[in-house]
């Protein structure tokens, strides 16, 4: 629905704006103040719905939230009184800076294009994520090293539209591993940015992490098992050793960086947890022992349980090689069943989709699968808001609608706690106080 915007409080009274938005003591008037009238507001910290709330925003941040807040003269009013308002969504596993979607594993995809071409191709990816309601993403690796750093900074400057990004800069991977560009003849020398994160042995791992820290990354992405969409890789295999993973976590800690670890295999998952990573990505073949370990250590799992649909569709369209489909055989259902077990066990789970496997802007499709496989709609919403902010270490900045936090706000018609599929098509998006979609 279209929002109704007015700038004069007296006009609001005459127009019949709800009484719950008119009483109370107003803060000082300011042309920078925006007032959102929320018919329903999802309190993601408490896991409950509040009725008839006013959100006062000054600049980029929320100033006050509550019933009966007066709207200062001159404020811009956004009437969402017939909608449900919730914090901007967070996808904790994306790959926005890799250009156009390509899951063929063909190394020529990267060798035919300059870094500049890939960067320009990636701009629509960021916009699609933002306009689908995701105001923050944790971008966990780019084949073109540091393209994600440049994209993050361009968004922060306002040069391009996109979500707030937390980036990894590159993949920390073994030679020929799940994060390496494979299928290249041994006498071909790759450009530096196509093998930037390769490391073998604990000291090389530390060296790579030191480089990435110097490059200004927000986190480290390391891979402890093979991958599905990678030539010559096997998701059941172990890649980095426990010793190497521990070195990564230790070195990252020196720079205040958290570690996300790709792991499909049972042992790869356990090694990642033992090493002390912040999150295990995919966690496909986690067993009961691994689930117990994750719960005991407070390790987050980020399980992309919607991707199977996109991989199958791409396979039918011959857009994915047969060996990739062989890797994927039965893994999707195994991952979903293990997701259900993790939910039942009370393991920390954060929302992440591996955006780029499925088309950018479709991350919201995963919510229905999370509910189908064990979460309540409120738990699914919390996984993409308060839990995701906790995983990122920024609960003071976003993840709930609270004074002092960024004004990252989305709204839907209807109640997503009753119908979580409403989050597949979000009609109102605000990031840091600026409306991008209404």
Predicted regions and their residues:
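Active-site gating loops and adjacent loop-to-helix segments of metal-dependent hydrolytic enzymes
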Residues: 97-118, 175-194, 228-242, 297-332
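Histidine/acidic-residue-rich catalytic or RNA/ligand-binding cores of hydrolases
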Residues: 100-104, 148, 177-178, 230-232, ...
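His/Asp/Glu-enriched, well-ordered alpha-helical/loop segment
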Residues: 108-110, 254, 258, 322-323, ...
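Histidine/acidic residue-rich metal-binding segments in metalloenzymes
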Residues: 150, 203-301, 329-349, 396
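Divalent metal-dependent hydrolysis catalytic cores, especially in the metallo-beta-lactamase
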Residues: 121-148, 161-171, 217-230, 258, ...
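Metal-associated gating/positioning segment near the N- to mid-region
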Residues: 83-153, 157-159, 175-179, 243, ...
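Histidine-rich, glycine-flanked metal-binding segment
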Residues: 24-27, 41, 46-86
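Bacterial N-terminal signal peptides
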Residues: 6-18
């Amino acid at each position: 629905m279209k929002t109704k915007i007015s700038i004069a409080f007296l006009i609001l009274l005459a127009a019949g704006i709800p009484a719950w938005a008119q009483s109370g003591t107003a803060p000082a008037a300011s042309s920078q103040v925006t007032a959102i009238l929320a018919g329903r507001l999802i309190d993601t910290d408490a896991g409950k719905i509040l009725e008839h709330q006013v959100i006062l925003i000054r600049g980029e941040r929320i100033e006050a939230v509550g019933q009966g807040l007066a709207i200062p003269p001159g404020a811009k009013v956004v009437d969402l009184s017939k909608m449900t308002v919730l914090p901007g969504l967070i996808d904790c596993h994306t790959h926005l800076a890799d250009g156009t979607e390509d899951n063929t594993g063909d190394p020529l995809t990267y060798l035919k294009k300059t870094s500049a071409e890939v960067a320009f191709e990636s701009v629509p990816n960021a916009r699609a994520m933002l306009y689908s309601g995701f105001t923050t993403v944790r971008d966990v690796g780019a084949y073109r090293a540091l393209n994600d750093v440049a994209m993050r900074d361009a968004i922060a400057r306002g040069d391009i539209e996109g979500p707030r990004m937390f980036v990894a800069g590159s993949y920390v991977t073994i030679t020929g591993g799940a994060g390496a560009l494979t299928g290249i003849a041994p006498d071909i020398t790759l450009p530096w940015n196509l093998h930037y994160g390769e490391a073998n042995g604990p000291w090389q791992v530390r060296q790579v992490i030191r480089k990435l820290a110097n490059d200004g990354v927000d986190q480290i992405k390391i891979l402890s098992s093979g991958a599905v969409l990678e030539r010559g890789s096997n998701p059941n295999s172990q890649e980095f050793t426990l010793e190497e993973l521990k070195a990564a976590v230790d070195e990252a800690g020196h720079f205040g960086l958290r570690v996300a670890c790709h792991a499909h295999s049972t042992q790869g998952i356990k090694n990642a947890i033992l090493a002390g990573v912040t999150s295990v990505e995919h966690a496909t073949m986690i067993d009961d022992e691994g689930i117990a370990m994750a719960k005991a250590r407070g390790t987050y799992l980020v399980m992309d349980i919607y991707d199977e649909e996109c991989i199958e569709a791409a396979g039918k369209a011959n857009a994915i090689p047969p060996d990739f489909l062989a890797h994927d055989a039965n893994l999707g259902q195994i991952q979903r069943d293990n997701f259900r077990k993790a939910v039942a066990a009370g393991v920390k789970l954060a929302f992440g989709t591996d955006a780029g496997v499925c088309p950018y802007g479709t991350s919201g499709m995963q919510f229905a699968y999370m509910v189908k496989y064990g979460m309540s709609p409120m738990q699914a919403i919390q996984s993409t808001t308060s839990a995701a902010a906790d995983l990122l270490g920024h609960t003071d900045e976003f993840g709930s609608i609270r004074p002092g936090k960024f004004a990252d706000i989305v709204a839907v018609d209807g109640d997503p706690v009753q119908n979580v599929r409403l989050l597949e098509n979000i009609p109102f998006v605000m990031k840091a106080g600026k409306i991008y979609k209404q």
